[in-house]
Regions:
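Class I SAM-dependent methyltransferase Rossmann-like catalytic core
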Residues: 1-50
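Class I SAM-dependent methyltransferase SAM/SAH-binding core
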Residues: 58, 62-109
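Short conserved loop adjoining the S-adenosyl-L-methionine
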Residues: 110-115
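A conserved beta-strand element that flanks and buttresses the S-adenosyl-L-methionine
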Residues: 121
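A short, conserved alpha-helix within the catalytic core of class I
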Residues: 129-139
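Conserved beta-strand signature within the Rossmann-like core of class I S-adenosyl-L-methionine
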Residues: 146-154
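Short, glycine-/aromatic-enriched active-site segment of Class I SAM-dependent methyltransferases
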Residues: 154-174
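Short alpha-helix
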Residues: 174-191
Length: 217
């Protein structure tokens, strides 16, 4: 399931990327900035959806500095396949800093959970997976009926480049190469309702979007 060469290469490069990206960043300054970044995303979400203080929240594919950072007032679960490596090799991530989070080591494809979560975040992680179909199914399956799914994605802006990037590792970190409509349809075809789409950042190859869905029921 996670044995494809693109996925293995992406996981190797992901860790190296984080080491490179954080190499000159002071831990305290970076964590303060990143937490505020997530707080700003939550403010955007609040225009369209809300949840109670006793909500159960999942951060799927969290990485070392995920949405969990900004959810200190909630009961949170978070998972990522590289959490042990992040904690061992990055000074910017220690699980003990987040006592309100239940961390687990898992891929999206392997994550199986009863529908107990009111809100599921998957922030810039879905294009990292090996099996897109099972990963999408597992995200939805973790939600309670009527639950909220919030994603950020990098969506291709040009069909021609999307085809090229799919054929060769033009974007090594991301085995999945989709455009906005393809991302939206992954969830619409599974009965989710699209609540909001917001462009966060534009670039030549990719647009960075915030997507909000609600599970049927």
């Amino acid at each position: 399931m996670n044995g494809t060469w693109k996925w293995k290469l992406a996981q190797f490069v992901e860790l190296k990327w984080w080491q490179w990206y954080l190499r000159n960043k002071k831990t305290e300054d970076y964590l303060k900035w990143k937490k505020q970044y997530w707080k700003d995303i939550l403010k955007k979400c609040a225009h369209d959806v809300s949840w109670s203080k006793d909500a159960e929240i999942l951060d799927a594919g969290s990485g070392p500095a995920g949405m969990f950072m900004a959810l200190e007032d909630y009961s949170v679960a978070a998972f990522d396949p590289l959490l042990p490596e992040y904690e061992a090799r990055l000074q910017h991530f220690k699980k003990e800093w987040y006592p309100y989070v239940r961390f687990a080591v898992s891929t999206l494809e392997a994550f199986k959970n009863d529908p107990i979560f009111d809100v599921v975040f998957c922030m810039n992680a879905l294009n990292h997976v090996s099996d897109l179909e099972s990963s999408t199914n597992n995200l939805i399956a973790a939600l309670k009926p009527g639950g909220i799914l919030i994603l950020t994605i990098d969506a291709h802006t040009h069909t021609s480049f999307k085809k090229i990037f799919r054929a060769i590792p033009g974007d090594i970190l991301h085995p999945q190469q989709l455009d906005l409509n393809e991302y939206q349809n992954l969830f619409l075809q599974r009965g989710c309702k699209l609540v909001a789409t917001e462009l966060l950042k534009h670039s030549f190859f990719f647009d960075h979007y915030l997507l909000i869905f609600r599970r049927s029921g």
